[in-house]
């Protein structure tokens, strides 16, 4: 799917710990925790963890926006994330 496309392209260009890989990983965790919270609405520790993950992903995307705008746009469009600015 989209993550496989990102993974294959980023492995050819960058290392596994690249910003793009981290954003993909965090996005997968966000989706998983969001689904968990739909079932368990009062799981406040998961809500707090989700906010922390979203903050980290936002910081990474801000860094990517400043460093390489074309990669930023590609990641945003591939993952279906709203743009920061």
Swiss-Prot record:
It is found in: Plastid, Chloroplast. InterPro entries: Ribosomal_uS15, Ribosomal_uS15_bac-type, uS15_NS1_RNA-bd_sf. The keyword Plastid applies. GO terms for biological process: translation. The keyword Ribonucleoprotein applies. One of its GO terms (cellular component) is ribonucleoprotein complex. It holds the Pfam family Ribosomal_S15. One of its GO terms (molecular function) is structural constituent of ribosome. Keywords: Chloroplast, Plastid, Ribonucleoprotein, Ribosomal protein. Its main location: plastid. Belongs to the universal ribosomal protein uS15 family. Part of the 30S ribosomal subunit. This is Small ribosomal subunit protein uS15c. It comes from Chaetosphaeridium globosum. The lineage of its organism: Eukaryota, Viridiplantae, Streptophyta, Coleochaetophyceae, Coleochaetales. The gene is rps15.
């Amino acid at each position: 799917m989209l993550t496989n496309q990102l993974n294959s392209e980023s492995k050819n260009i960058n290392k596994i710990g690249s910003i793009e890989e981290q954003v993909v990983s965090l996005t997968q965790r966000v989706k998983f925790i969001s689904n968990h919270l739909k079932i368990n609405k009062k799981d406040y520790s998961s809500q707090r963890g989700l906010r922390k993950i979203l903050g980290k992903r936002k910081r990474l995307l801000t860094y990517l926006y400043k460093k390489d705008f074309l990669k930023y746009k590609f990641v945003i469009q591939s993952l279906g994330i709203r743009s920061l600015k």
